[in-house]
Amino acid sequence: MQIDGREITSELEIIRALQAESIGKTEFVVLDNGDDFIQTAVGCLEYRANGKNYKAIPEPIEKEKIQTAFLSYFRGDGQYLQDFTWEEIVYESIWTKLKKLFKK
């Protein structure tokens, strides 16, 4: 797994990256595992698995809960999936949005 292209080998590295985001040294943190990831920015928590994206609701998510989710993802124990209510993020192209707008 990686953060900013750096291989992550310990939970401490994840904690430090999240602390940097919480004090404004970075805008977001993405822990990626190939095509899948977990990410956070400004109290938002999202993950991607099997080509689908999800966000934790309701927002904002507390910093401690975000850290717990990142560590769970790193360990591969799946606990983060049970700790939140997840909503699928569905992306629409600009053309689809425009068509809907002009049908009204």
Residue ranges of predicted features:
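Acidic, proline/glycine-rich low-complexity IDRs
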Residues: 1-104
